[in-house]
């Protein structure tokens, strides 16, 4: 069990093609863990990381906010703040300038909510209000992730060998299938037990 835990804690399943072609949906990617095998403060531009993302659950709301406030999503980043809020509210915090662009920074106050692990590449490392943040993007995506990611959100870093991420193709599809079609697994188990029950009753 310990061996299985150690193995599973060093792999992550790629669930989309946002990092295509270096990683594809269904790949199993080999990672190292923050705080144990690397210091998240040492993450730099070009690293592929796994971070705890809030934005996937608010993606459509963020698009509406950008539209209502006449914001350009290509130059907008959100810092998510969880708390005892009933609904999401947004306020402008300021602006940062990088070598690549200028970004308007907004704070999104949200109710306590789950996060989703996202495997994307760091494209910039910035300072804002005396804190270090990362701007992150999927290689195959036209735009950066809308969330300005703090150091504490970085959980894993993809292991790279000779410039290529260490992946095992297709193995992750089993995990994806079980998550997306869990109800079929439950149905199969119920049918199996019902069959055995009825079969036993006829004896």
From Swiss-Prot:
Locations listed in the record: Membrane
Gene3D superfamilies listed in its UniProt record: Umud Fragment, subunit A
GO annotations of cellular component type: membrane
SUPFAM superfamilies xref list: LexA/Signal peptidase
A GO biological-process term: signal peptide processing
Domain of life: Archaea
Keyword Transmembrane helix: yes
UniProt-listed PANTHER family: SIGNAL PEPTIDASE COMPLEX CATALYTIC SUBUNIT SEC11
Protein name: Uncharacterized protein MJ0260
Species of provenance: Methanocaldococcus jannaschii (strain ATCC 43067 / DSM 2661 / JAL-1 / JCM 10045 / NBRC 100440) (Methanococcus jannaschii)
